[in-house]
């Protein structure tokens, strides 16, 4: 079986750099590491069936996860079952139950709604299945053994810092007129992205550097149901028509690339100069827009790195070594969950070619749009 050790080594080296390096419970229902079950006892068999439950395939990162998991699990000698729930919680619950019935020994779950999988995952855990959250936290249940994700609060901080940098570079002197967008409220990452961003932006709002002209500064006001680009564009249309008839919008905090493109399209259609807009996921279309100067930034969270880290955990279980040591933890509402946290990267026009230098396909996109 193919083994991957580079990610775990990087995690060990990065421990001092994580947002919180507190240790966490990884035992079945225990409250502390002192009482935790010995993780070395948690194993899976050679060639185990691994179920991967993704929320949907509507964005580039989830399409990539679907393709990469199928290929990498099969190459490593496992039996993969990879499905997506089309953003419907009932679909995901049924798919996970079917994976259990088909003999999955590991479940990798990117939840549609992190609070709605407790019952089906608790049944899976009772059957001895190891449960790994992928990209998103599984909330309000003991039935999660660890989560692989890029630091969500850090991602939000990076988005906000890039927005401020872009405003200074492209929009002259402060004050700046901005608006705030957030992701889908069912996705636990969306709140964390927003919280991280606001930790950077709120002091600038308070001191007058930034003005949120609409006054919509709460997560509930900024949230975009289901991460739907069309809903984001409709909200941006309304914000512009209601607040910017006689003024320019300078920048927008956007939680991902699809919403960023919707925001920019709305601004163009309203006759506004293109605002400075943040993003997330380094989608190919947004890479083209960054190369051309249309979108200011994105935050790269390479899917391959997430899958590689998940594979290393599965390989560790198959080798009889149990769950590897994590470098972070987070409260899921019931317990502290081990987090295998990876570091995101801000990408702007200034470092675009350097970051993607080894990716021929993306470099072709960049060169076609410079």
Which residues fall in each region the model found?
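A residue-level marker of the well-folded mature domains of exported/periplasmic proteins
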Residues: 2-8, 22-370
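Repetitive helical segments and hydrophobic/amphipathic motifs
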Residues: 12-13
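C-terminal motif of bacterial Sec signal peptides marking the signal peptidase cleavage site
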Residues: 16-21
């Amino acid at each position: 079986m193919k083994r991957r050790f580079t990610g775990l080594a990087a995690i060990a080296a990065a421990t001092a750099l994580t947002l919180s390096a507190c240790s966490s419970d990884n035992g079945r229902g225990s409250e502390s590491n002192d009482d935790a079950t010995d993780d070395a006892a948690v194993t899976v068999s050679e060639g185990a069936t691994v179920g991967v439950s993704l929320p949907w395939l509507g964005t580039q990162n989830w399409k990539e996860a679907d393709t990469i998991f199928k290929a990498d699990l099969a190459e490593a000698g496992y039996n993969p079952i990879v499905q997506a729930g089309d953003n419907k919680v009932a679909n995901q619950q049924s798919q996970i139950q079917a994976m259990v019935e088909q003999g999955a020994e590991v479940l990798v779950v990117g939840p549609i709604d992190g609070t709605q999988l407790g019952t089906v995952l608790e049944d899976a855990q009772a059957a001895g299945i190891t449960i790994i959250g992928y990209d998103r936290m599984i909330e309000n249940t003991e039935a999660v053994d660890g989560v692989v994700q890029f630091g969500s609060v850090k991602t939000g901080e990076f988005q906000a810092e890039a927005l401020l940098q872009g405003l200074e570079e492209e929009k002259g002197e402060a004050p700046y007129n901005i608006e705030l967008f957030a992701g889908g409220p069912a996705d636990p990452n969306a709140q964390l992205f927003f919280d991280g961003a606001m930790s950077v932006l709120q002091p600038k709002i308070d001191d007058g550097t930034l003005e949120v002209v609409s006054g919509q500064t709460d997560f509930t006001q900024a949230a975009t149901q289901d991460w739907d680009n069309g809903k984001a564009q409709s909200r941006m249309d309304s914000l512009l028509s209601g607040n910017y008839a006689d003024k320019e919008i300078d920048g927008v905090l956007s939680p991902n690339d699809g919403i960023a493109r919707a925001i920019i399209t709305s601004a163009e259609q309203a006759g506004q100069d293109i605002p400075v807009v943040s993003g997330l996921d380094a989608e190919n279309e947004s890479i083209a827009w960054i190369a051309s100067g249309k979108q200011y930034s994105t935050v790269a969270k390479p899917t391959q790195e997430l899958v590689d880290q998940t594979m290393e955990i599965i390989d560790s279980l198959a080798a009889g070594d149990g769950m590897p040591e994590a470098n972070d933890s987070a409260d899921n509402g019931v317990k502290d969950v081990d987090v295998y946290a990876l570091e995101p990267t801000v990408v702007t026009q200034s470092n675009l070619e350097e970051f993607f230098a080894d990716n021929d396909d993306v470099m072709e996109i960049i060169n076609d749009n410079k």
